A protein has these predicted regions:
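Short Lys/Arg-enriched alpha/beta "domain-start" segment
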Residues: 1-34
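Acidic, aromatic-enriched beta-alpha/helix-loop junctions
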Residues: 23-64
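Surface-exposed beta-loop interaction hotspot
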Residues: 68-83
Length: 83
């Protein structure tokens, strides 16, 4: 499991579309390929997530998570990695 605390913007596209504006978030990448995006407010439920199986692509300022066998996609644009 990998935990990242970052100031980031998250865009989901697929069955629906959603944009989470830039804010401080906890990104959780689990060993099964699932990904969860949490904020400091709003309780225990993630603001966005992607269930396994996924493909995760990383660059210096962006993480792209794609659902295998589907069109669902999370684009996480990193402004600052805190930890």
């Amino acid at each position: 499991m990998r935990l990242v605390v970052a100031r980031c913007e998250v865009r989901y596209s697929g069955r629906l579309s959603a944009v989470l504006p830039e804010a401080l978030r906890l990104l959780m990448f689990k060993s099964d390929g699932s990904v969860m995006v949490h904020s400091d407010t709003g309780g225990y439920k993630p603001e966005n997530w992607m269930t396994a199986p996924t493909v995760i692509e990383e660059s210096d300022d962006e993480i792209v998570v794609r659902k295998l066998g589907g069109e669902d996609r999370l684009d996480i644009r990193l402004a600052e990695i805190v930890s």
